[in-house]
Amino acid sequence: MVSFKKICVGTLLAATMLGIGGLMPTAEAGKLEDIQARGTLLVGSTGDYKPMSYLNKETGKYEGFDVEVAELFAKSLGVKVEYVPTTWKTLTADTMSGKFDIAICGITRTFARAQKMDMSHGYLLFGKTILCRKADAKKFKSEADLNKKSVRVMVNPGGTNEKFALANLPDCTLLVHPQNAEIPGLIAEGKADVMITETMEARRYTRDDARLAAPLLDDPFTRNQFGILMQKGDQEWLNYVNFFMEEKDMDGTLDKLEDQYIK
């Protein structure tokens, strides 16, 4: 026979558990679930960085190493890619506001970005270097050769190229041009002497335009890696992004894309 005392204790315990359960917050869907429910992966891209992520104005389509990665990433989720335009100047604000799920367009991993946003493990090793006219290649052998008032250095606004120039070339004549993809052509035409860029981009533009040279390509000023940028706070999403990149590195996909777009 069950005693009244046992019934009371059991009832009290059940009521207590029910009360606790009622106070516990309902688990919210994370980014991973949101994307799969939506059916699209929102990808932020500046669309101005050959060979990483470049908007081909003739076809209206994005091209490059990071574009291929984004497409494969979306495929792993069973969704399609929708590109969201951003700029180097607004990249941080756009990422922090959740304008897109990831940003992947040749984004340098930096401490400043890591403090405000989540960033994937690094991929592809590169460094800051210069692009100049082939006729001027012998003039620029070191950073000191750039840091002169007579040298017109052109950069795009808001990114690490501008930050590098401001920090390391205080005596140069710094020119800021809004469209990164237009700067190599302006250098070739003599509108500026040097573009601060990265080894990946410099290699591509010297291949595409015989008027250009990258004399310091094998001895860059810095050593960096790219990363995928995300709004801070969703550890499950960050884990999935890192897992995907590790898998694609392990199975040779990243090496194949590097051979196709960079080497």
Question: In which residue ranges do the predicted regions lie?
Answer:
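Extended ligand-binding regions for polar small-molecule ligands
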Residues: 68-76, 134-136, 144, 150, ...
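Periplasmic-binding protein-like
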Residues: 125-129, 199, 203-246, 263
